[in-house]
């Protein structure tokens, strides 16, 4: 198994500097990771840093709370793509999901989907804040909107990826979308457990540790 090709090499901390971002790009090239995942202000820097590699540019949108306006999310996604993003990881509006305003949640995702045509869209549902039924509903709405992936977590809330959530999400989306596990995955064993239970992609800041075992 080419574990490196499952890894979105990630740095989303508020205090990340341009030098830090360049460093993870160099690491992504060295280890041949699938992508580098960053906040949107660094999209163009990552694009430039990865121009001679196969690694993709992944940018987060509405991160980490998902509570910004739909127009703002769509604009951030559109701008990220203009700056060179190949993939967009957006956060759903969690509060609206929990109050069962599914129409809002759908329109929110759809607006970002419409702004990202031709690019990969991953929808972060923040599993640690949801019941199993809410997780299923979030996955169903994401699929309905044409998301390419559903993703467990931001890594900035009360918990990260769990094997049981990955399995639930995979069972829900079946072959209609892929699953990205992220948040708290620090070892090869943890990454393999996620993959064995349905994860198609791993988001981690510990990518080197994961592939080196």
Curated annotation (Swiss-Prot):
Q: Where in the cell is it found?
A: Cytoplasm
Q: Which UniProt keywords apply?
A: Cytoplasm, Lyase, Schiff base
EC no. given is 4.1.2.4
Question: In which pathway does this enzyme or protein participate?
Answer: Carbohydrate degradation; 2-deoxy-D-ribose 1-phosphate degradation; D-glyceraldehyde 3-phosphate and acetaldehyde from 2-deoxy-alpha-D-ribose 1-phosphate: step 2/2
**Looking at the keywords, is Lyase present?**
yes
Family membership noted in the UniProt record = Belongs to the DeoC/FbaB aldolase family. DeoC type 1 subfamily.
NCBIfam families, from UniProt? Answer: deoC
Q: Which PANTHER family match?
A: DEOXYRIBOSE-PHOSPHATE ALDOLASE
What function does the entry list?
Catalyzes a reversible aldol reaction between acetaldehyde and D-glyceraldehyde 3-phosphate to generate 2-deoxy-D-ribose 5-phosphate.
Protein name listed in UniProt: Deoxyribose-phosphate aldolase
The UniProt gene name for this protein comes to deoC
């Amino acid at each position: 198994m080419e574990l490196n090709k499952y890894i979105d090499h990630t740095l989303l901390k508020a205090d990340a500097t341009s030098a830090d971002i360049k460093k993870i790009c160099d690491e992504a090239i060295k280890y041949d990771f699938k992508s580098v995942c960053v906040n949107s202000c660094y999209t163009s820097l990552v694009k430039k840093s990865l121009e001679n590699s196969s690694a993709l540019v992944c940018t987060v949108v509405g991160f980490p709370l998902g509570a910004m306006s739909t127009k703002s999310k769509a604009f951030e996604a559109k701008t990220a793509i203009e700056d060179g993003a190949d993939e967009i990881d957006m956060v759903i509006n969690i509060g609206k999901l929990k109050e069962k305003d599914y129409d809002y949640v759908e329109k929110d995702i759809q607006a970002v989907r419409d702004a990202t045509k031709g690019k990969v869209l991953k929808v972060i549902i923040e599993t640690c804040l949801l019941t199993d039924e809410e997780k299923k509903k979030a996955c169903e709405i994401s699929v309905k909107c044409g998301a390419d992936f559903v993703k467990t977590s931001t890594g900035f809330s009360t918990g990260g990826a769990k094997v049981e959530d990955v399995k639930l999400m995979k069972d829900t989306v079946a072959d209609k979308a892929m699953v990205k596990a992220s948040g708290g995955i620090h070892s090869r064993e943890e990454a393999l457990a996620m993959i064995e239970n349905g994860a198609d992609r791993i988001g981690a800041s510990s990518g080197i540790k994961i592939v080196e075992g």
